[in-house]
Amino acid sequence: MTEALRYVLFYESGNLSLAAENFPAHRARYEEFMRRGLLLSLGPFSDRSGSMAVFTTREAAEEFASGDPFVQHGVVSKWTIREWREATPG
């Protein structure tokens, strides 16, 4: 078993009626972080209460959230980062 330290960004939903108009800029931001190798995965919770994203560093998670159009325009009401020890076979 191998372990890697990851940082999980949790979003709580805010005004979801603003999501569609801000999604193109949000998508461009997460695609940039994926290209840079800083963002490993992301997605919403099925109950629409929020979403989560997994980053390689705390700094990347903070940088992402602070500049995310979803945060800046109220689609997200609150965000937090938690350290996670990812265990994988091998």
Regions found by a protein language model. Give the residues of each.
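Conserved, structured core segments of small domains
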Residues: 1-90
